[in-house]
Amino acid sequence: MINTLSNIYKQQGNEIIDKIFNDHLIVSEQIDGSRFLFQKLPDNTIVYYKKDGEQINYIDRTLMKFYENAITFIENMPIAIKVNLPDYWTFGFQYFPSSAPINIVYDRMPKNHLILTDISIRNEVGRTTKVIHDAKVLRDWAAKIDVEQPPIIFNGRLSDFQKSQLKRFLETPDEDLIQLFKTQSFTRYIISILNPKLTSSALVS
């Protein structure tokens, strides 16, 4: 979010930032996992996808075992859960085959190797008609599927203090930010503004 806001601020200035800051915001921590998705079809078939939207087929599964933990978990979900998955809903996750799925080493694994991040509703031809980011909906589905809830840092409207602190950050020259974050965690700094009650980032002790 912050990198995106920084680019918007540099290109379009305060006016667009003020508009964004006055809206209802949902801010999630970006997790360094691998993208994994599944979709239930009307015949109760489950289809799996990689990060690029390409389907994971049986040949992929035979030659590449990378997604097996996630696929096996979904395949073994209780029937009562599977049949109640809405048709054509596609559940998106950050997948952890290990505690270091890409570059960052995390202190713990997410529940059943998966963090639910989004749900997209598609039609019969595969076109996305709606994307669900609502925090409550995602939390409810994460509980039903039995995976880690999305790491939501903030959900609501910013206070004047939060707006001023974030603006101050955006207005700070890049070279000063580089110097600052040699000694201070960028993630912890942003969390301290958005949600001071959080004592650590997701999957980190």
Cite the ranges covered by each PLM segment.
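Core nucleotide-handling region used for phosphoryl-transfer chemistry
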Residues: M1-S205
